[in-house]
Amino acid sequence: AGYEPLALLCERKHITGDAATIIERCGNIPVYTGKRELLATLTGYTLTRGVLCAMRRPKPHSIEEICREARRIVVIDGVVDATNIGAIFRSAAALGIDAVLLTPTSCPLNRRAVRVSMGSVFLVPWTWLDTTFSKLHDLGFRTAAMALTDHSISIDNPLLATEPKLAIIMGTEGDGLSYETIAEADYVVRIPMSHDVDSLNVAAAAAVAFWQLRAPDSNK
């Protein structure tokens, strides 16, 4: 995934055990040892598998690099909960999303986001969205804002299935997408619901959207 290993920290018993293969693959980097309690303190949870690795982040991709050949992308706009970000990435990897764009409030490398994603943050190309959606239009994308408004269309509307390149925009927990983002979108899309339920958690809504709005022939 382009992340350069810098150092390893593991329980001493794992140096010749579970960590041996990892140490060999990482090459000539420092290997430190510590007690299990220390590893748990650093990670924030007790399940560590006994090995931690510090890595250098690669240089961020440009939007053009990761979106030029993409057909379905997701824009995570203002989502701050690490659990939701991790879950969205896992669904994106499983359901055919080609790239993820994030606003600065959303960090996929938060340790909880990485854990919840089951490592999917290292599988799906992602980068920061620091401009308006006009750049997506320049790359040939139509935008679909997931929001409940008086003028939103159902997620199963046939028009959406015909779009060769579609950017699905998911908003923050609670407030959802801003009025400006909704006004700028090519489509405003809602998920039909029953039993007087009017909304879903953003991660759950993302999974529904990714499946329903998948690219034509993507499941063949």
Q: Language model features by range: what are they?
A:
Residues 50-54, 117, 163-171:
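Short basic, glycine-rich beta-strand/loop surfaces that mediate nucleic-acid
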Residues 53-55, 91-95, 105-108, 112-122, ...:
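Structured adenosyl-cofactor binding patch, chiefly the S-adenosyl-L-methionine
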Residues 145-197:
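Active-site/ligand-binding-proximal alpha/beta "capping" segment
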